[in-house]
From Swiss-Prot:
Region (NMP): 30-59
Assembly with partners or alone: Monomer.
GO cellular component: cytoplasm
Pathway the protein acts in: Purine metabolism; AMP biosynthesis via salvage pathway; AMP from ADP: step 1/1
UniProt protein name: Adenylate kinase
Record-level Gene Ontology MF annotations: adenylate kinase activity; ATP binding
Amino acid sequence: MNLLIMGLPGAGKGTQAAKIVEEFGIAHISTGDMFRAAMANQTEMGRLAKSYIDKGELVPDEVTNGIVKERLAEDDIAEKGFLLDGYPRTIEQAHALDATLEELGLRLDGVINIKVDPSCLVERLSGRIINRKTGETFHKVFNPPVDYKEEDYYQREDDKPETVKRRLDVNMAQGEPILEHYRKLGLVTDIEGNQEITDVFADVEKALLELK
């Protein structure tokens, strides 16, 4: 089974990806892991990526696409299938993935889209607070400290509501064309992500068993 998993930051995509991989025994391909492995193994694309990263530059699409292609060409993929997590991030990368899969004789079976209302995500992501003395992390709503005093805690810049909202807006603008592309191919299953983790996975599992 060959899958993509999509969802906005904070939707619980990483948690569900780990559960899918454990339950179905498929290869988890996350962008970060792919880059690290390609650079550690000094593949052609890994060396290219490192040259950009070392200069503090963004890795261009053709290198990212090349790293994905190298990984999808490995033997375990044909045997186990894959779950792509964090790629494609743009519609151009989605088109490159289509071409790569066709070239390698692979087929995408489904796209799992974890849906959560953006306003809920702002609450989830902007509630994180850190104790000034201990560095411990808490959440104002979901995991509040017992002895909360505002002056004892601070919030990182990128956890502030306005920053979180901007990040979500960027992700939505990039993600919508990709979802639309795969919807036209009849591949997308929307999963309600604003429920307990186990309930989300029950819905994911049901959808995947129907694909098999």
